[in-house]
Amino acid sequence: PLADSLSRSYGVPASVILGVSLLESASGPSRNCRLLNNYFGIVGKNNLLRTRGIRTRYKQYATDTASFIDFCRLMTRKRFYPSLKNNPSSLLWVQAISKAGYSEVPAIWQKRVLSTIRQHHL
């Protein structure tokens, strides 16, 4: 329900929201996910060094939901957003996100996200 609600609010397909989160969080058990509530590999500030002695460049969120909302807000600030808003094509969205530099390995990331979307019938 969260991905569907965010999809309606932000115009980003739920399949893309879920596909990226599944890949970036290793379906939930990743360290970023567990310690930072970060399901999307978004870089930013955190307090893990101070609280646990762990140095990381990834952003910390108060809740899982906050991570999902931040991903959607991040998409609204991308150049491609106006032309793709409310477009249901996962392929076009993933290609645009990849091309915009979301990942350090865009071609591999794109393949993996699209594969995740297909594999989970999103």
Describe each region flagged by the PLM.
Residues 1-122:
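Catalytic cores of secreted/periplasmic lytic hydrolases that degrade extracellular macromolecules
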